[in-house]
Curated annotation (Swiss-Prot):
The lineage of its organism: Eukaryota, Metazoa, Chordata, Craniata, Vertebrata. Residues 19-36 have a biased composition (Polar residues). Promotes expression of the ion channel CACNA1H at the cell membrane, and thereby contributes to the regulation of channel activity. Plays a minor and redundant role in promoting the expression of calcium channel CACNA1S at the cell membrane, and thereby contributes to increased channel activity. Slows the rate of calcium-mediated inactivation of CACNA1C calcium channel activity. Pfam families: C1_1 (PF00130), SH3_2 (PF07653), SH3_9 (PF14604), STAC2_u1 (PF16664). InterPro entries: C1-like_sf (IPR046349), PE/DAG-bd (IPR002219), SH3-like_dom_sf (IPR036028), SH3_domain (IPR001452), STAC1/2/3 (IPR039688), STAC1_SH3 (IPR035508). Expressed predominantly in brain Detected in brain neurons, more specifically in hippocampus, cerebellum and inferior olive. Highly expressed in urinary bladder, and detected at lower levels in adrenal gland. Detected at very low levels in heart, liver, lung and kidney. Keywords: Cell membrane, Cytoplasm, Membrane, Metal-binding, Repeat, SH3 domain, Zinc, Zinc-finger. Residues 39-51 have a biased composition (Basic residues). Residues 1-51, 212-264 are annotated as: Disordered. This is SH3 and cysteine-rich domain-containing protein.
């Protein structure tokens, strides 16, 4: 029996309603699009997790549930929008390992057989891992800890730190190592030094600062000559004597410098004068400061002192290492320190009349014509030992004349 058309339409509508009421199976296109969205979410979550782990040092300690919750909240805020439908059994719907195993980072070492190609030291006994044919040993696959086979039995259970992130090794390890390296020095220095200052160190430091100050003052005027402010203080100060009779006097004088309160810079000219008059062997300060010019010096500035070979110079100031202040008769000025030679009381000054080329193997030196030299020795077999600047050796006496 054929049902009427109205009934057929009603039944058709009922079937349509039933079909819409029941859940239709997803199409392959919708399933693939859903899987692609899940893969994108997984990649983004893994990238964010790696970036967060590389910037933090909390991975070295076991995290608890309270530590995992802020990270989950941070990831939820970082990816706003409608969350995709979770498919049962998919990786996104599975709980994280940190939530299930809060102490997963505290696993033990996983040692494996390893052949070491480079020289490696055992982390337990600190001896090199060697072998007859190959350097066999044990190595942890995660933290790369290397030990001997014999050291594995006596090794206590230790927590494996895992593989260090590159960002942590780069930004955190070096400062920690530097602080640990110099930590013992920081502890020892206050105990060793204290508040006591060595007087010798104070005097040397003050002399260095004074020399630098004079150099700066001389460079400002266009020449390396030191200023004339301290010349009056150093006129009467002699240099150290080389004679045997003045050894104790000079030693007492040098030791007394550090007993003055202001780094030994008090006025001690009176003491120098009294010391020079003690005993018959004391030398004249003027004779102690006598120099002879070795070369000719043409003045470059108004304050420079013109010199010719053989001129006798009285030293007035030697605070600067390169430029000294001296006096020739009634002329006063600055001259290079390496252009003069000191003359003692018992020394003689000679001039070379012709060029002499000496043999170094025989202890001789070369002298040019009109070169000045100083000696305190006597003639031996026609030769005499002279001193000219930094050169010292034998020259024949017939090429020298007195100045």
């Amino acid at each position: 029996m054929i049902p009427p058309s109205g009934a057929r339409e009603d039944s058709g509508d009922g079937l349509t309603g039933e079909a819409t009421g029941t859940e239709q199976p997803p199409s392959p296109a919708s399933t693939s699009s859903l899987e692609s969205k899940l893969q994108k979410l997984k990649r983004s979550l893994s990238f964010k997790t790696k970036s967060l782990r590389s910037k933090s040092a909390d991975n070295f300690f076991p995290r608890t549930n309270s530590d995992v919750k802020p990270q989950a909240d941070l990831l939820a805020k970082a990816s706003p929008g409608p969350s995709p439908i979770a498919i049962p059994g998919s990786p996104a719907s599975m709980p994280t390992k940190a939530g299930l195993h809060p102490g997963s980072n505290s696993k033990l070492h996983a040692f494996q057989e390893h052949v070491f190609k480079k020289p490696t030291f055992c982390d337990v006994c600190n001896h090199m891992i060697v072998g007859t044919h190959a350097k066999h040993g044990l190595r942890c696959g995660a933290c790369k800890m290397s030990i001997h086979h014999k050291c594995a039995d006596g090794l206590a259970p230790q927590r494996c730190m895992g593989k260090l992130p590159k960002g942590f090794r780069r930004y955190y390890s070096s400062p920690l190592l530097i602080h640990e390296q110099f930590g013992c020095i920081k502890e020892v220095m206050p105990i060793a030094c204290g508040n006591k200052v060595d007087p010798v160190y104070e005097a040397l430091r003050f002399g260095t600062s004074l020399a630098q100050r004079t150099k700066k003052g001389g460079s400002g005027s266009g020449s390396d000559s030191p200023p004339r402010t301290s010349t009056s203080e150093l006129v009467d100060v002699p240099e150290e004597a080389d004679g045997p009779g003045d050894g104790s006097d000079m030693r007492t004088r040098s030791n007394s410098v550090f007993t003055y309160p202001e780094n030994g810079m008090d006025d001690f000219r009176d003491q120098m004068k009294t010391t020079n008059h003690q005993g018959p062997l004391s030398k004249d300060p003027l004779q102690m400061n006598t120099y002879v010019a070795l070369y000719r010096f043409i003045p470059q500035e108004n304050e420079d002192l013109e010199m010719r070979p053989g001129d006798m110079i009285t030293l007035l100031e030697d605070s600067n290492e390169d430029w000294w202040k001296g006096k020739i008769q009634d002329r006063v000025g600055f001259f290079p320190a390496n252009f003069v030679q000191r003359v003692e009381e018992h020394e003689k000054i000679y001039r070379c009349v012709r060029t002499f080329i000496g043999c170094k193997d025989q202890g001789q030196i070369t002298l040019k014509e009109n070169q000045i030299c100083v000696t305190s020795e006597e003639e031996q077999d026609g030769f005499i030992r002279v001193l000219s600047g930094k050169k010292r050796g034998l020259v024949p006496l017939d090429v020298l004349v007195d100045v």
